[in-house]
């Protein structure tokens, strides 16, 4: 079976619309796909209807941007099987979207003040098509270099990392609350790419809050991560999931879908 349970669209920080993603999925023989846009379930109903017409089963999803305050690390929680407008998630994530949008506007102002040739209207247009303005929108308005290129990565790191003029983050929700809320809204709470964010240590606490899955297969995971996730899944009786973390032109993964191991 070919599936993908971690995909982003223009509703958050992806470059492709729901329709573009699903058309690609259908062409590649993807049977099941979850849209897991950051901190929003917007558009899932229409996406599911489009998926039915194209022969792709669309699973409602979300990726909650969260934090482990005890260890000082970012944590991402996938919610699979949730519906558009899921009330508890909307209440939890709404403030995150507001903070991210305000921070991105601040970053845009810093770029303009510093004299960078940034297409402000293009950035704002991309933000309007999404649920808020993202760094990826600012980069798209700043350079035509493709995401995987060394020039893109160098520019991004110089501006948004390591003390650059746009290096400012926002406050996130507690990862434990994220798990509880996904469960409250009827979804399967999954620890996303723990190898990428080194969030393994938090897993026992999240299980106590209702965590039901762990993302084993992810482009940033090594074989050691695969093995560790499999072992933890058995120990804590978790479902193993996998996905591409596809962002279109705003990411390094070229396409959606992967073959689920037997």
From Swiss-Prot:
| SUPFAM superfamilies associated with the record | PHP domain-like (SSF89550)
Please tell me whether the keyword Protein transport is annotated for this protein.
no
Provide the binding site for Mn(2+) 1. 6, 8, 63, 245
Q: Under which EC number(s) is this enzyme classified? A: 3.1.4.57
EC main class here is: hydrolase
GO molecular function per UniProt: 5'-3' DNA exonuclease activity; 5'-3' RNA exonuclease activity; metal ion binding; phosphoribosyl 1,2-cyclic phosphate 1,2-diphosphodiesterase activity
| Superkingdom, natural source | Bacteria
UniProt keyword list: Hydrolase, Manganese, Metal-binding
Catalysed reactions, semicolon-separated: alpha-D-ribose 1,2-cyclic phosphate 5-phosphate + H2O = D-ribose 2,5-bisphosphate + H(+); D-ribose 2,5-bisphosphate + H2O = D-ribose 5-phosphate + phosphate
For this protein, the record's InterPro entries field holds:
Cycl_ph_dihydrol, PHP_dom, PHP_domain, Pol/His_phosphatase_N, Pol/histidinol_Pase-like
For binding Mn(2+) 2, which residues are annotated in this chain's numbering?
13, 38, 247
> Where does this protein hold Mn(2+) 3?
63, 76, 193
SMART domains this protein is in? POLIIIAc
This one is known as Phosphoribosyl 1,2-cyclic phosphate 1,2-diphosphodiesterase
Its encoding gene is what? phnPP
């Amino acid at each position: 079976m070919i599936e993908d349970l971690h995909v982003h669209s223009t509703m958050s920080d992806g470059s492709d619309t729901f329709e573009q993603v699903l058309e690609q999925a259908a062409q590649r023989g993807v049977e099941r796909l979850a849209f897991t846009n950051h901190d929003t379930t917007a558009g899932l109903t229409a996406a599911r209807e489009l998926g039915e017409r194209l022969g792709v089963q669309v699973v409602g999803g979300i990726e909650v941007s969260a934090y482990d305050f005890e260890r000082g690390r970012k944590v991402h929680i996938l919610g699979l099987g949730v519906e558009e407008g899921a009330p508890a998630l909307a209440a939890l994530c709404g403030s995150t979207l507001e903070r991210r949008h305000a921070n991105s506007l601040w970053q845009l102002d810093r770029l303009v003040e510093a004299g960078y040739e940034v297409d402000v209207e293009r950035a704002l247009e991309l933000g309007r098509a999404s649920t808020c303005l993202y760094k990826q929108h600012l980069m798209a308005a700043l350079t035509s270099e493709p995401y995987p290129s060394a020039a893109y990565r160098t520019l991004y790191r110089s501006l948004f990392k390591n003390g650059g003029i746009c290096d400012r983050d926002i406050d996130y929700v507690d990862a434990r609350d994220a798990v509880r809320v996904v469960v409250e809204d009827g979804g399967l709470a999954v620890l996303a790419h723990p190898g990428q964010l080194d969030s393994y240590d938090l897993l026992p606490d999240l299980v106590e809050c209702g965590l039901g899955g762990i993302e084993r297969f992810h482009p940033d995971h090594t074989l050691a991560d695969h093995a560790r996730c499999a072992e933890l899944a058995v120990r804590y009786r978790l479902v193993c999931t996998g996905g591409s973390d596809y962002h279109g032109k705003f990411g390094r993964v070229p396409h959606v879908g992967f073959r689920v191991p037997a």
